[in-house]
Every structure is written in C-alpha cells, then in structure tokens.
Amino acid sequence: SWVRLRDRRSGREFRVLSLHLDHISHEARLAQVRAVEEETSQYPAGVPQVLAGDFNSRPSNPVAGVLVGAGWVDAFVEANGEDAEHMSFHRFEGDAYKPKKGTPGRIDYIFLKGTGIRVVSSAFVKDCVGGKYPSDHYFLTADIVIE
C-alpha cells in the first residue's frame, strides 16, 4: 500500500509505503522487495519516500541489503548506530520471548529515501495493557523531518 501526500505549508510531496513480506520463502521476500524497489525507483530523488513494514528478515539478510544498496536509509540504524540490534517479533510474550532456534532479531523496518528527508530518532514501543500486547511485534517509530 502507498499514499502520496503533500505538506500543506511547503507544498512538498512525499510518499509513504507499507508492506508485509512473505514469512516463509526467502526467495519470495527477495522478489517482493526487488519489485518494491523497482516501483519506488521510478520517482525522482526530489520526492522523499518512507517505506515501513514487516520484512520478515534480519538486518544481515540480503532482503534489507537490496534496499540499502539502492540508497535507502534504515531509520533505526541511522538514529541508534550500526550495532543496534533489537528484537521486534515477540509472539505476544514481550521480553519473555526466546526463539527456539537462532537469536532474536529485528524484522521490522522504516526506510527513508530521497533528498531533504532525515531521521531524528527511532525506537521500539513496547506497550502492553494488563500484560497483553496489541500485536506480536513491537511497534517501530521514527521521527523524521522532510525539508
């Protein structure tokens, strides 16, 4: 899904895109992210773009690398440093969740691309009410500026 928006004060247009990549097939995720990159690359650099969602891939996976290689900036890493590795999926268990195999990792992202767009901060929100989480993922936020 995507939407093209216009800032009322500046008149500047920008795009916000949301996705949820396949959770089973690595090949499907690669094909999906390549299709998204192909579509988004049709817009000039002067149109800032924000791409957010569940990529079902850790930062070291080639799926994220497709976007980084095409000039997208990982907002969380930009705001928190290259070594920022956090778990974003938790199966409604919060910090008590321990994966059966491997180590926990971040699979949710906010990417930025274009001139005049930058991240100010990015963090995971771990809200729960009465021990119940509204999602099996922590919410990822980013404060961005479009100049």
Residues of each region from the PLM?
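Hydrophobic/aromatic residues located in beta-strands of well-ordered beta-sheets
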Residues: 16, 49-51
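Active-site metal-binding loops of divalent metal-dependent hydrolases
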Residues: 19-21, 54-55, 138
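A short, histidine- and acid-enriched strand-loop-helix "catalytic/donor-clamping" loop
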Residues: 24
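Structured beta-strand-rich core segments of catalytic domains in phosphoester-bond hydrolases
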Residues: 1-13, 21, 120-124
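Metal-dependent phosphoester-hydrolase catalytic domains
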Residues: 4, 27, 31, 41-49, ...
